[in-house]
């Protein structure tokens, strides 16, 4: 599929549900110590994503955009500021952003010149690794806002997400010292349209938060099933079921209608399953 190298904000707004948006904002800073960086962050993308956050991205970014962080996507070497990882290592990083080959990626920046320098650098990086459906958002986030595009100001957008996600934090069923009362949990599930007797498949990143929600759901009379592999397994074995275009989570479910409720990190996916009548 051929795509335009440069796309206008109005087009992005109109095609928002069919693209994967990446924020390539980067704040200039002195080059990191090579030995220290390699010891702490080299090919340790989870650590980097937890510790090397960009304040501009956290303050404001396009709704649903993940941050393509130059301080993580590349590494410093003796003679290069932004050294390229191997294709396998790079793929491991961008999968954490919910990016898979075949997605139409739209990359934007901010600040001077609309952030086109950083966005273009990210563009050519993806092209180097064989990603062909990549575009740059002309004018960056400021132009997007002028086109009535939606932005958000929080730090929970990174990571893999499902289409039409509805957040259901573990805090809906757990308090600081343990599970909430059954009546409170009943109300929390009911608020999401999940009632006694419904069958749900519950999953999260690695199965921890989902286990607690699954237990609370079972206590509330819901037929709760835990998907052990979680988003982590899906990212490697069935990435087509992730990243804004999810239509089915489990291959065996062929005659069921699924509504997805996704959570990031300490959140979980609850999939309400109803038989088609």
UniProtKB/Swiss-Prot annotation:
Q: Where is the active site?
A: 204
Assigned keywords, A-Z: Repeat, Transferase
User: What SUPFAM superfamilies does the record tag this protein with?
Assistant: Rhodanese/Cell cycle control phosphatase
Q: What is its EC number?
A: 2.8.1.1
What Gene Ontology cellular component terms go with this record?
A: mitochondrion
At the top level of its lineage, which domain of life is listed? Eukaryota
Q: Rhodanese domain location, by residue? A: 15-153, 155-243
Gene3D superfamilies per the record?
A: Rhodanese-like domain
Induction behaviour: Expression increased by knockdown of mpst-1.
Any one Gene Ontology molecular-function term assigned to this protein's record: thiosulfate-cyanide sulfurtransferase activity
- Keyword ATP-binding assigned to the entry: answer is no
Q: What class of enzyme is it?
A: transferase
> Which reactions appear under catalytic activity for this entry?
thiosulfate + hydrogen cyanide = thiocyanate + sulfite + 2 H(+)
By its UniProt entry, which InterPro entries does this protein fall under? Rhodanese-like_dom, Rhodanese-like_dom_sf, TST/MPST-like
About its domains, the entry says: Contains two rhodanese domains with different primary structures but with near identical secondary structure conformations suggesting a common evolutionary origin. Only the C-terminal rhodanese domain contains the catalytic cysteine residue.
Q: What is this protein called?
A: Putative thiosulfate sulfurtransferase mpst-4
In the record, what lineage is assigned to the organism producing the protein? Eukaryota, Metazoa, Ecdysozoa, Nematoda, Chromadorea
